[in-house]
Design a protein with these regions (language model features):
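Short, glycine- and small/hydrophobic-rich beta-strand elements in well-ordered beta-sheets
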Residues: 21-29
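Catalytic core of pol beta-like nucleotidyltransferases
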Residues: 1-17, 21, 33-39, 50-217
């Protein structure tokens, strides 16, 4: 598995060589940030520059090509002003799931009010509902179902925050805090993540009913 501390040190060094004082923020998201990484986990980097042009995207891409584990690198690249004007419901998850390496995202906090949390839950539930119905009727894909449960686990994090005021990053800890309906979602996600067998119809029906409930909340 990647030594993420050494890897991010090298990433920051290389990024600084390429973009210098234009760097506003660098962070780590995903399983490496949560301490839940496996051999196949992505390295989910967040980079916010003063601004981003097409040339910057090309330059960043060329920089990534020089780094080890290139095939595992993913993440988010943006200009500062775009981020500060981003949809607040997206920023709720973004802020709370990002581990700072350089700089701070605290300027986003003013945008993360109760309405943003409620909207994150609503939009997430609507997207899961649509994805679930579409998959049950057309693709009938176990891989899509796994992705929908992953998305649902993020919605559960927002629900937990709404109900308790706590943002819980680690899914196993989340499982101990949330209500029974949400426990089913998180438990199923963890089972699927660890390679558990898929009961397509039952899992789809459970996810459909759960998302339906939260759309109407």
């Amino acid at each position: 598995m990647v030594d993420i501390s050494a890897w991010t040190d090298k990433f920051l060094q290389t990024l600084t060589q390429n973009f210098g004082e234009r760097i506003w923020f660098v962070g780590l998201q995903g399983s490496y940030a949560r301490g839940e990484a496996t051999e196949t986990s992505d390295i989910d980097m967040v980079v916010i520059l003063d601004e981003v042009s097409v040339l910057d995207i090309q330059k960043y891409n060329a920089m990534l090509d020089t780094l080890s584990n290139r095939e595992q690198i993913c993440g988010f690249l943006s200009g500062k002003q775009e981020l500060l004007h981003w949809e607040p419901s997206d920023l709720f998850q973004f802020y709370n799931d990002t581990k700072p390496i350089k700089g701070s995202l605290d300027e986003l906090l003013v945008l993360l009010d109760t309405a943003a949390v409620n909207r994150a839950i609503k939009i997430g539930a609507c997207n899961i509902y649509h994805g679930c119905v579409h998959n049950m009727l057309y693709e009938k894909s176990e891989e899509i179902l796994r992705g929908l449960y992953k998305s649902a686990s993020f919605v559960v994090q927002a629900i937990c925050f709404k109900q308790t005021g706590k943002y819980v990053c680690q899914q196993k800890k989340l499982l101990q805090i949330v209500e029974p309906d949400e426990q089913v979602i998180v438990h199923t996600f963890l089972e699927l993540k660890s390679g558990g067998l898929t009961n397509f119809q039952k899992m789809s029906e459970t996810l459909f009913e759960w998302s339906k409930k939260w759309i109407k909340e």
